[in-house]
Structures are given as structure tokens and as C-alpha cells.
């Protein structure tokens, strides 16, 4: 029976951690190892983790100095022994059948990745699909959908074969580490199978890593840099993706530059780098048919 490693970065999660870990221990797929990585918590999160390790031998607890979510995930990947890997954030929780369902789908369809739908809210609010829709996406289509960010690049609603992760690790980022990690492993994925069943639940809270920087400068800046990089790569390798990538690079660059202007930081390296990209591709940006007029006006005036 295949082993699934479930990786949970833990940081000051007193109010949510037990719900999270209980949902993993309650999985109908029982051959699990649960790696709880305490990332320098200042509350009693580590003690809660150790309590679970004493009760269930499948729980492995690690403690490290605070380094952020990517660092904690990478630490766990270095110690994981499973054939499959899943990721759950410490304030999220999952349906009892999530990993059994995804593992079965991946086995049936010989897929490298399995994905389910997610939702915000309570588990009892979930509505099961009357008939589960199964979608199998082959390598070329899957690559295009994620590379252009048409599909979300989250890792928490997915199950991965360990073999496709290999030595890949999460890059340090405040907002888009999942997106950057998925970009690294994209060329290795030959097939993904997904279901519309809602098996994963997430929480939005003020200090949630994935939400706290939403619609802020940091989010816009990191996405701008990422899409600029993808666009420049696509010019040589994937010309069919160029228009959408340039649209995203431009819109996020404009948002980040506006935020820097508001803070009177036009002389920073970040602003200068964003402006240089916009200048270099100004003609192509202004020719984009579906780029919002407000962005074109900003490019025309400020670049």
C-alpha cells in the first residue's frame, strides 16, 4: 500500500491546528505519515504537535527557527518518506475521503497529479456533486493552463507523486511560492486527473500567509516579476502564450508601479526594473487588444 506524506507547516496556529490535524488523522486512507513542522511558533503550537505525536505514531514533529512557509515545507520534503505527497496549511482542513479519492483517481488514470475542488467555509456546508465530473489533462494542455495561470497553481488541493517532485523545492516568496514551485515541476507532469468534488477547505484570516498580501504591493510586485520572466521565456520557447503572459505582466507591473509612486519610491531598484521592462516592450503592450485602457494610459504616460 502506497504511503502518503502529508506536510503541514505550523506557525502560531493554536486556534486552528487541532481541527487541521484531526481532519488528516481521520482520513479513510490510513497509510500516512504526517509531518508537522513547527516554524518557530511563539504560542503552544509545538506542544500541540507533540501531543499528537504521542498519540499516533504516524505523526512526525519537527521544530526549526522561523523561516517562513516555504522553508518549513522544504524541511519536510527533505524528511518525507512517502510515495505520494500532499500539502495542508495549518488553518485548513480536509474531508475524510480526500486522499483516498485522489490516490484512487491517480491510480486509475495513471496520473502524476490528482486535484479536487476546494471551498471556503465549514465542512458541514459542503455539497457533494450529484455526479462527480472527472477531467484528465494531458501534458501539453496542462502545461499551457498552468504556465499562463489560467488554472490556479495551488498545491494544497492536489496530491503529487513523489517522483515528479524529486529535488524541487519551494522558492522563498511572500505570496506566490505555490505558483513558482508548480512552474519548476511543470515539465515533469505528464497527466493530471481532477474531480469537481469539494474535498478541501480553506480559511481566510488576517495573518493567513496566502491571503494577507492579497491586493497589495508585494503581491502585485511578485506576480509582475514572475509574469515578466515567463513572458521573456515564452518569446523563445512558447510564442502561443505570449499575449496573455504580457497582459498579466503589464497589469501587475502597473499596479506595483502605482503603489511605489504613491509611496514616493520611484528611485528604488524595484521601480526602475519594472519601468525598464515596460519600456522595452511598450509597443507590444500598447498593441494588446484586451489590456484595460487604464493600464495602457499608465504605460503611455509613465513609461
What annotation goes with each model-predicted range?
Residues 12-26:
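Short, well-formed alpha-helical segments that are part of the catalytic scaffolds
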Residues 85:
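Short aromatic/hydrophobic "clamp" motif used to bind/position activated sugar donors
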Residues 8, 31-40, 60-65, 90:
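Short beta-strand/loop segment that forms part of the nucleotide-sugar
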Residues 23, 30, 38-47, 68:
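A conserved acidic beta->alpha catalytic loop
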Residues 262-303:
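Membrane-interface aromatic/basic loop that binds lipid-linked glycans or pyrophosphate carriers
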Residues 69, 90-193, 203-218:
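Donor-binding/catalytic cores of nucleotide-activated saccharide
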Residues 2-5, 23, 33, 180:
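Cell-envelope/extracellular polymer assembly enzymes that use nucleotide-activated donors
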Residues 64-80:
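Glycine-rich, basic loop-to-helix element that forms the pyrophosphate-binding segment
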Amino acid at each position: 500500500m502506497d504511503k502518503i506524506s502529508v506536510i503541514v507547516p505550523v506557525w502560531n496556529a493554536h486556534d486552528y491546528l487541532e481541527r487541521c490535524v484531526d481532519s488528516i488523522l481521520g482520513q479513510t486512507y490510513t497509510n500516512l505519515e504526517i509531518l508537522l513542522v513547527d516554524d518557530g511558533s511563539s504560542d503552544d503550537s509545538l506542544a500541540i504537535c507533540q501531543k499528537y505525536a504521542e498519540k499516533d505514531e504516524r505523526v512526525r514533529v519537527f521544530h526549526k527557527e522561523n523561516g517562513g512557509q516555504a522553508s518549513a515545507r522544504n524541511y519536510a520534503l527533505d524528511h518525507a518518506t512517502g510515495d505520494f505527497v500532499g500539502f495542508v496549511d495549518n488553518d485548513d482542513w480536509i474531508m475524510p475521503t480526500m486522499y483516498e479519492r485522489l490516490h484512487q483517481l491517480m491510480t486509475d488514470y495513471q496520473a502524476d497529479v490528482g486535484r479536487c475542488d476546494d471551498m471556503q467555509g465549514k465542512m458541514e456546508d459542503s455539497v457533494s456533486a450529484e455526479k462527480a465530473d472527472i477531467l484528465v489533462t494531458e501534458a501539453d494542455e496542462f502545461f499551457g493552463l498552468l504556465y499562463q495561470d489560467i488554472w490556479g497553481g495551488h498545491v494544497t488541493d492536489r496530491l503529487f507523486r513523489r517522483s515528479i517532485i524529486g529535488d524541487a523545492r519551494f522558492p522563498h516568496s511572500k505570496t506566490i511560492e505555490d505558483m513558482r514551485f508548480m512552474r519548476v515541476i511543470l515539465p515533469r507532469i505528464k497527466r493530471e486527473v481532477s474531480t469537481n468534488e469539494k474535498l478541501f477547505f480553506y480559511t481566510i484570516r488576517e495573518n493567513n500567509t496566502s491571503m494577507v498580501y492579497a491586493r497589495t504591493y508585494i503581491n502585485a510586485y511578485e506576480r509582475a516579476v514572475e509574469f515578466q520572466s515567463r513572458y521573456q521565456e515564452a518569446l523563445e520557447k512558447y510564442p502561443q502564450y505570449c499575449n496573455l503572459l504580457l497582459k498579466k505582466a503589464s497589469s501587475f507591473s502597473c499596479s506595483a508601479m502605482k503603489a511605489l509612486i504613491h509611496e514616493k519610491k520611484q528611485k528604488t531598484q524595484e521601480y526602475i526594473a519594472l519601468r525598464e521592462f515596460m519600456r522595452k516592450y511598450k509597443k507590444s503592450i500598447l498593441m494588446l487588444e484586451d489590456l484595460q485602457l487604464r493600464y495602457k494610459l499608465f504605460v503611455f504616460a509613465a513609461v
